[in-house]
Amino acid sequence: MDFINIEKKWQEFWWKNKSFEPKDDFNLPKKYILSMLPYPSGEIHMGHVRNYTIGDALARYYRLHHYNVLHPMGFDSFGMPAENAAIKHGIHPKTWTYENIEAMQKEFEALGFSFSKNREFATSDPDYTKFEQQFFIDLWEKGLIYRKKAMLNWCPNDKTVLANEQVIDGRCWRCDTEVIQKELYQYYLKITNYAEELLKDLETLENHWPSQVLTMQKNWIGKSSGLQFGFKIADECLKACNNIQEIEVFTTRADTIYGVTYIAIAPEHPLVEHAIKRVSQEDSKMIKAILNTTQRERALEKKGAFLGIYAIHPLTKQKIPVWVANFALANYGSGALMGVPACDERDFEFANLYHIPIKVITQSPQNLPHTKEEILKNSGEWSDLSSSVAREKIIAYFEKENLGKRVINYRLQDWGVSRQRYWGAPIPMIHCKHCGIVPETQLPVTLPEDIVIDGEGNPLEKHASWKFAQCPKCHKDALRETDTMDTFIQSSWYFLRYTTPKNQRENQAFDQNYLKYFMPVDTYIGGIEHAILHLLYARFFTKALRDLGYLHLDEPFKQLITQGMVLKDGAKMSKSKGNVVSPKEILKKYGADAVRLFILFAAPPAKELEWNDNALEGAHRFIKRLYDKANAITPTTSKPEFKEVGLNEAQKLARKKVYEALKKSHEIFNKAESAYAFNTLIASCMEALNALNAQSDEQILCEGYFVLLQILEPMIPHTAWELSERLFKRENFKPIEVDESALIEDFMTLGLTINGKRRAELKVNINASKEEIIILAKKELEKYLENASVKKEIYVPNKLVNFVTA
């Protein structure tokens, strides 16, 4: 079997005939099948192969069944690795990127992926950047982008800012370097404006997205309802506080307000700047050090200092000490919180560490802290009430007395999108001394190519002829913005661009007719690691573009498949572990179809896949057996006709196995609850081939192969096209319906029991009468009934026969 040449033959045929381009007929039923676009690193890995094999199987199935399928591919081509390659190898990022794209395209073709070439692009293409920059300006003018100075997550290795979502366990999501804090100006997208909608619309994705992803997004958005109120600064402390009148706090546990024994404020809180003069030199040094630590570092060890000032409890009028605490976050609520050590684990630990008094306000006999809902005590007029009842009454009291109000808070923060690097989409803004920040009018703003990348700072800052520009408003000298956009902006709308053919998107980001027809994406495939990065950003960007009038949908992805990682020797494949399997080498040895079949058979998409050379050999042998048995079939040039006349049991079994597999294929591809368990479908195909291998009747073989090749085409397309052309001619190879009559059993299996104890099984004709079944059952149980007296015979149709003996 010369699988290499067979695969090349069909790959050339597909590209030459543009077999995978969707039709421009908006009346056809459509499917938009999309795998997350890759970064062009130069070589695809097994994670790519798995992702794109799953997507390709879906696309080919729907195409075979007369859907108008959009199955595109592109490249997420801006980013740090290109700059790192420039430093390491002395090659321009653009050259490195586009050479890698070309290499990866060849690998995709070698795997037989049915991508639409007429939709392909790279996100670093100038005509893509042009419309992205226009979106940026539109969002700026609508007030959905702003610029401010803030303490930001900084990756010392990549020398760039990271969004909160890009810091994982205190480390850079890309290079795993420990992140530090740095104060810089930054552009922000107001994703918080959409927090409630992003949260609420998760309900529309239930049963279509993995529950784990929905939970991760829900927790990241982090909605909480509570009481916002103030502790007034004690009169004698006002001067030290530069006349700041009160400390505003937010709490979800208003019922614990009588247990407050300290107030904790973030080191970034404006009060600290003035009151820090009252602390010791050692504490002052510690507070300043906290400012330069990440949230993860702050969580490792609780630290704080008493500021020497007090605030007044709004109900008891007692003086409450004010502390700086590293666990108080400036970007959540007001940056201040009430410390209730009797009812909160964190507050309790901090109080014990610094010997702060603890006031018990619940009637629980358990050890402190009492974190569960309890009956209150020492809580004024709300004593003896449950926590939940007291909470509502206290909030109502605060609102009635104008002491505070009920508010909603979100953990979600605005998305910082400025990056201090060269290889990214330039932010299209001009800084003018006279006009302020002015949007550029000549788009796209492209990157200068005559740059030096040495790893020291942002190359655009050093490029005078590019950096110095003219203000579009007053035409005086000005400075161009040298930060580039976070690459997650590019991946937040690429799926919209795919809808439109290349020749119709030169002057528009996407065509409205194509957009309305193909969107939303029907099935989106990618790793779960993107749950609160790309997937959340893409949902937000879709809603923001909707509000700008660019589109008319709320959610971009109807259904989501998160495929598991590919492991070898129990660990994720990586060069450092020395357990990488090269797709290129495997393709040379086994061919694309064997690799695809193994990928789909080894595990369901959502599960981790353990690489297994023996299983790959097994996939290869299955394909060889498929070719071998095909030699027993006489090719036909017309569509074969199938008749079920006078078949023996083995022939009926073969037909049954084939049509069972066909029925299963429709369930696997069309029912989300099947979890796309291709492994079970392939197992059914293997059973069907085993049954066909036992046959010599050419009619049975012909029908079996006609059906089996249709089932297998999405998974092993080269083999299916080769054999269907050879045996039936492709023009005759149309989808066939499940023959339900072939699935009907002629026999049924009954359990045989004596006094309820199972003794044997009986296979009988489904048309056998009760009397016939009883006679056959007694004969089968003869040795058990030999010396027994049967008092009662019980027949439960289609299930069992039970004999009650004396």
Curated annotation (Swiss-Prot):
Chain positions recorded as ATP binding sites: 575
Q: Which reaction does it catalyse?
A: tRNA(Leu) + L-leucine + ATP = L-leucyl-tRNA(Leu) + AMP + diphosphate
Per the record, the GO terms for biological process are: leucyl-tRNA aminoacylation
Gene Ontology terms: cellular component = cytosol
- Please indicate the residue ranges that the annotation assigns to the motif 'KMSKS' region: 572-576
SUPFAM superfamilies on file:
Anticodon-binding domain of a subclass of class I aminoacyl-tRNA synthetases, Nucleotidylyl transferase, ValRS/IleRS/LeuRS editing domain
Q: Report the subcellular localization.
A: Cytoplasm
EC id: 6.1.1.4
Q: Which UniProt keywords apply?
A: Aminoacyl-tRNA synthetase, ATP-binding, Cytoplasm, Ligase, Nucleotide-binding, Protein biosynthesis
UniProt-listed InterPro entries: aa-tRNA-synth_I_CS (IPR001412), aa-tRNA-synth_Ia (IPR002300), Leu-tRNA-ligase (IPR002302), Leu_tRNA-synth_edit (IPR025709), Methionyl/Leucyl_tRNA_Synth (IPR015413), Rossmann-like_a/b/a_fold (IPR014729), tRNAsynth_Ia_anticodon-bd (IPR009080), Val/Leu/Ile-tRNA-synth_edit (IPR009008)
Instruction: Give the GO molecular function terms.
Output: aminoacyl-tRNA deacylase activity; ATP binding; leucine-tRNA ligase activity
Motif 'HIGH' region: chain residues = 38-48
Q: Which Pfam families match?
A: tRNA-synt_1, tRNA-synt_1_2, tRNA-synt_1g
Q: Which residues form the signal peptide?
A: none
Where is this protein chiefly located? Answer: cytoplasm
| HAMAP family in the record | Leu_tRNA_synth_B
Q: Which family does it belong to?
A: Belongs to the class-I aminoacyl-tRNA synthetase family.
PANTHER family reported for this sequence? LEUCINE--TRNA LIGASE, MITOCHONDRIAL (PTHR43740:SF2), LEUCYL-TRNA SYNTHETASE (PTHR43740)
What is the protein name for this chain? Answer: Leucine--tRNA ligase
